Amino acid sequence: VAALAWQIDAFHGGRTMSALLQVSHLGKSFGGVKAVDGISFDLAPGELLALIGPNGAGKSTTFNMVNGQLNADQGSIMLQGQELVGRKPRDIWRQGVGRTFQIAETFASLTVVENVQMALLSHDDLLLSMWRRAADHRRDDALALLDQVGMKPQADRPCNVLAYGDVKRVELAIAMANDPKLLLMDEPTAGMAPKERNELMALTKDLVLQRGLAVLFTEHSMDVVFAYADRIIVLARGRLIAEGKPQDIRDHPQVQAVYFGTGKTFEKPSA
């Protein structure tokens, strides 16, 4: 496994120097109502950035503009100097962006390793209809990806017998098939027990360190956010209201007010 190639640079003027991803003045409206109103943020290699906010804050809209499912009305999304606004999700994937989904899905009739092989087949521009003739396509590479997520021992099991936490691990291996620079994770721990949540996020953290990934993730569990994010951006009513390290966000009065109203705070982590 390649060692971490980049280091997170220092902050300067609220922006990250040598950023992999640069989002600038991003905006999106629906029916004349601004869902996202001019937000800007950066993301560096080797960093996990959490995008959070209460319901209706604009985080899903922002996330879907970055992954290409929605077109921005204004602003820019630059990945290593390449504009992503207006690009289709497939083109963004080819640019080096991996993704996991809130509800993990695999081909239930295929084995664990075959699911990853299918992703590699697609990455290599081979038609999925060729699968029967290419059933051994890059099997060793698929097994190596599964080894990174702790699923190699279950490589030949059908996906429909896996526990949900293991399906999430397979999905993570699939997301690595295009050797991404940026990984987008939509509610990665949704529907998981606390132990499974921690295992998945610890694994993600390891992949960030091993591969030099940049990770942007949305998440409702504040325990997960505070435990695993290197930095957090908080949206409310389409605007970015706070940005900083977990402890700074935990103690931020405006963030506390948005989530709880006045007089309440986030629970402190147990010793």
Language-model segment annotations:
Residues 5-16:
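Short, Lys/Arg-enriched N-terminal segments with co-localized hydrophobic residues
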